[in-house]
A protein has these predicted regions:
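Ordered, soluble secondary-structure elements with a strong preference for glycine-centered loop motifs
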Residues: 1, 33-41, 95-99, 165-169
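Short charge-dense sequence patches
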Residues: 1, 46-58, 118-127
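Histidine/cysteine-enriched polar flanking segments
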Residues: 1-15, 53-58, 185, 208-217, ...
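N-terminal low-complexity, intrinsically disordered segments
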Residues: 1-31, 38, 42
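Short, charged beta->alpha transition segments
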Residues: 9-13, 69-74
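Hydrophobic alpha-helical segments and helix pairs
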Residues: 30-72
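Long, highly charged amphipathic alpha-helices
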Residues: 42-49, 53, 100, 170-177
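Membrane-proximal, solvent-exposed terminal domains/tails of membrane-associated proteins
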Residues: 70-73, 77-96, 103-230
């Protein structure tokens, strides 16, 4: 807390203000699980040493309370950590040409990135959904010139998207257009043909998950959600 500014500020190497109160935080969970006793102890020890260095007073929560909270947070996150996919597969046995796939993806506004996936992004550059290969090869500009694949998969990472149902609608629209252009079929992960009713059910599930997150005060697609689901 800056004495001069009267506001909470992030401390950087070039900060010139004087601080009367400093708050430090530790992320309690991510996709690897809840924070453990060892990491928590190291964090608390570091805070003790920092306070001693500046002859300051320190307020710390009880370790067992933090660990209990971390486990509860991790359990909740695990319950809503869902990635939902829609596949477009070739049923004629000819395969999809990589050059045509790339053209269709780019025409739909998707960007090929270094992770081997096409990304649909919002106005801020955040990923809404991805398009990947069902085969072993990743998508790469050079590889796609000669690639032939039996199918592609569209994937939506539910906790990391602000408006999941809207992102899903766009994803399905692109998948349907691609299926029509390629002569493919929309199927789920078990290769069952996706009916309109099944697609509506998936959309409803996305909305339900994101509502649960909002109640837990983790806004889907927010900075907090991106930290927790990483």
């Amino acid at each position: 807390y800056g004495e001069g500014s009267g506001q909470w500020r992030t401390i950087t190497a070039h900060a010139a203000d004087r601080y009367s109160v400093v708050a430090a935080s530790l992320q309690l969970a991510d996709r690897r699980g809840a924070v453990g006793e060892t990491d928590l102890a190291a964090f608390l020890d570091g805070m003790h040493r920092l306070a001693q260095h500046f002859a300051g007073l320190i307020e710390l929560p009880a370790s067992h309370e933090v660990l209990t909270h971390a486990r509860a947070l991790d359990e909740f996150c695990a319950g809503v950590d869902v990635q939902l996919g829609v596949n477009v597969v070739d049923v004629a046995g000819n395969g999809f040409a990589g050059t045509k796939l790339r053209g269709l993806a780019e025409a739909a506004g998707l960007e090929l990135r270094g992770d081997g996936l096409f990304h649909a992004v919002d106005e801020y550059g955040a990923t809404l959904f991805t398009l990947g290969n069902l085969g072993p090869e990743i998508f790469d500009a050079d590889v796609m010139r000669t690639l032939t694949t039996a199918g592609v998969t569209f994937m939506l990472d539910v906790p990391r998207v602000a408006d999941g149902p809207a992102a899903f609608d766009r994803m399905v629209a692109v998948a349907r257009q691609m299926a029509q252009s390629l002569g493919g079929t929309l199927v789920d992960g078990q290769r069952h043909v996706l009916s309109d009713a099944m697609i509506a059910g998936i959309r409803a599930k996305i909305g339900e998950i994101q509502q649960q997150m909002a109640v837990y005060e983790i806004a889907p697609g927010s900075a907090r959600a991106l930290r927790l689901f990483s």
